[in-house]
Amino acid sequence: MYTGRFAPSPTGLLHIGSLLTAAASYADARSNGGKWLVRMEDLDPPREMPGAASHILHTLEAFGFEWDGEVAYQSRRYALYEETLCRLKTAGLVYPCHCSRKDWQAAARRGADGFVYNGRCRHPGQRPAPQGKQPAWRIRVPDRDIGFSDGIVGGYAQNLARDIGDFVLLRADGYWAYQLAVVADDAEQGVTHIVRGQDLLVSTPRQIYLQQCLGVPTPQYAHLPLLTNAQGQKWSKQTLAPALDLNRREQLLRQVFRYLNLPEAPETDRPAELLDWAVAHWDMDKVPKHAVTPP
């Protein structure tokens, strides 16, 4: 059975880009007779906005979204992540890293998603472990392409050794890394289809590699076009995208429907009816492949 999900981070309130992702993932799930889960990706408490998680859920309800089951909170799933890391340790796929970011980035080159880790701690005994310092844990990556066929973008691949380097699964400060948590959660929740923004396209080969290492199924991916401002920057909390105005719910839903190339919806003042209409007219093949700049 199709199982999709929407996974916001409570570092801020939902904005127009969040609404586009929620609407597209919801329409794709419901049009395929599937489930739509909501998962709160609250892995990084220092970056979270107080009250944002409850506000996000209230906003989704106000826009007519109905999710299946209980909301999952990553902050309550640390035992799952610990068990997942233990499996990788047992398989000999991970190693402790005592490098500070400043330490290794000084001699590193840029790759597909920031600096490529240079492997300073990859081989046991290569560097003495500092006393009293907790390490990060990294996974060894292969020198080969990891590719997949995206439902919107098409073919996409990375050579993880060249483009990314061995990446962190557990940070030295004790916080779990996004890549491990999202793979563990998707597998445990039975997620089969992931519809999300193209800013996460670059993360997907890492997640597929982790899925291969853990022997869990790889979902089908579809990465949505980003909404960008006049400067070409993604609409986000960092670029000061305004929070969704609950007094303009119908107008905002119609706006994201246009960005997704849905036909014009009939007049109604009920957001849930607009979502039902989007489900009935959903066509992934018509979703734009490239960024959209709202007028």
UniProtKB/Swiss-Prot annotation:
A motif ('HIGH' region) lies at residues 8-18. Keywords: Aminoacyl-tRNA synthetase, ATP-binding, Ligase, Metal-binding, Nucleotide-binding, Zinc. Gene3D superfamilies: HUPs. ATP binds at K237. L-glutamate binds at R5, F6, A7, P8, S9, E41, Y178, R196. Zn(2+) binds at C97, C99, Y117, C121. GO terms for biological process: glutamyl-tRNA aminoacylation; tRNA modification. Binds 1 zinc ion per subunit. A motif ('KMSKS' region) lies at residues 234-238. It is an enzyme of class 6 (ligase). Pfam families: tRNA-synt_1c. GO terms for cellular component: cytosol. Its cofactor is Zn(2+). GO terms for molecular function: ATP binding; glutamate-tRNA ligase activity; zinc ion binding. The keyword Plastid does not apply. Its EC number is 6.1.1.-. It comes from the Bacteria. The keyword Zinc applies. Catalyzes the tRNA-independent activation of glutamate in presence of ATP and the subsequent transfer of glutamate onto a tRNA(Asp). Glutamate is transferred on the 2-amino-5-(4,5-dihydroxy-2-cyclopenten-1-yl) moiety of the queuosine in the wobble position of the QUC anticodon. PANTHER family: GLUTAMATE--TRNA LIGASE, GLUTAMYL-Q TRNA(ASP) SYNTHETASE. NCBIfam families: PRK05710.1-3 (NF004314), queuosine_YadB (TIGR03838). Belongs to the class-I aminoacyl-tRNA synthetase family. GluQ subfamily. This is Glutamyl-Q tRNA(Asp) synthetase. It comes from Neisseria meningitidis serogroup C (strain 053442). The lineage of its organism: Bacteria, Pseudomonadati, Pseudomonadota, Betaproteobacteria, Neisseriales.
